[in-house]
Amino acid sequence: VSTMNAKTSSGGEEEASGMRNETLGEAKRRQVIYVAYMIAALDLTFLFMQMGIMPYLAKSLGLDSVGFGYLQTIFGVLQLVGGYIFGRFADQFGARAALILSCASGSIFFLLMSLSTSIPLLFLSRLPAVFMHGMPGAQKVITDMTAPSQRAAALGRLGLCFGVGIIAGSAMGGVLSTKFGIYVPTYVGLVGSLINTLIAMVWIPSQTKPKSDHHMTEHSTSRSGSLFSITEILRLMKFPGVMEVFIVKVFAGLPIGLFMIMFSIISMDFFGLEAVESGYLMSYFGVLQMVVQGLVVGKLASHCTEMTLLRLSVFVFAGVGLGMALMRTVWHYCIIAVPLVFAFSMLATITDSILTKAVPSSDTGAMLGICASVQPLTRTVGPTIGGVLYKQFGVSSFGYLQLVVNLGLFVYLLKSKIPLGDVKS
């Protein structure tokens, strides 16, 4: 009987694999995934490039620190609102259409930014950010085109793109704005985003899902046609394990997210760093991100269960919190950064993998959109909460908050029996 079951299981896997290969072919599928990585790397490079010059551009136009805070909050709110809508769009119209929308929105974003010669125009340039979701778009392509067993490792490699974006974007923004003028990086971002749009149009196929999943998608979209629906979000959260894992995803990284939002001020006031030294520190983070995602996350994902890795990332986060509470110099922070980047990368990769496997394939885009909204949510509420923590209790408060929250989550994960399974129908 066990032999028959094994054969049946093997036959089912071969049939599923055959459907996937029938859609595009193995070599073509790998090529499309590599193109998705390239689009994500370029998109993040341009994003970090504009983030580097934005404070200087805002200051040159006469915007004070309070106004700049409003500008950042608007960007966060737009990304927060657009994340889920973008995911639903990807489910209904395909990953290719979603990536084209993201890259085209990026082009409009940089065009408006290049024309921002006044404060109102600078605020107006934030509007296209509602559809600028290159990373979730690439995640959608990879989710559609990888088997569940390979998904965590494939999504983890996107962290390499993040590292490339931090290093290349920060460096390009600084060099171009210093040598050629503050608006030159926006011209580069405009041209680069247009090229990214063409790459998505030419190299990403119109249908990235296996044929069986494509029929499910058509059924799903006919059932719920609107791009934004609270009912649909609640429906996704009711799948086994989804709400529990999503809560861990939000709260485990929230304290460190607050710290990173305040980091520009902390680096000046607490560490006493100059702008150039802060840039070096960001590059160090980028290198760590690439090493961890390229050499560690994928290998651990292939040898350990996802629940084990989720618990590990939360436990390491708790240790990072203790280190942050005790740190006094930038060298302490450089040491803490190693487990910090590991926990951050592992948590993001594993939770995305678990959540996309826990919902039907016709809803993976919406689920990725919800996941992508976590960071903008932190950016929206972060300046207020982070500012109060820093002003009233100092840098150590971020560490103690990180320690307490993640110890609580670790105990919760040890005691709870979260059902983790592939729910594809």
PLM segments and residue spans:
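Juxtamembrane intracellular "pre-TM" segments in multi-pass secondary transporters
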Residues: 13-30, 206-247
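Short amphipathic helix-loop junctions that connect adjacent transmembrane helices
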Residues: 52-66, 261-277
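Hydrophobic core of transmembrane alpha-helices in multi-pass small-molecule transporters
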Residues: 41, 109, 120-133, 332-346
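Residue-level signature of mid-helix packing/kink "hotspots" within the transmembrane helices
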Residues: 76-84, 166-167, 286-294, 379-380
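Helix-to-loop junctions at the C-terminal end of transmembrane segments
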Residues: 83-94, 177, 292-305, 390
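Cytoplasmic helix-loop-helix junction between adjacent transmembrane helices
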Residues: 125-163
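Conserved MFS/SLC helix-loop-helix module at the cytosolic interface between two early adjacent transmembrane helices
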Residues: 81-117
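Structural signature of the two symmetry-related core transmembrane helices
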Residues: 97-111, 308-323
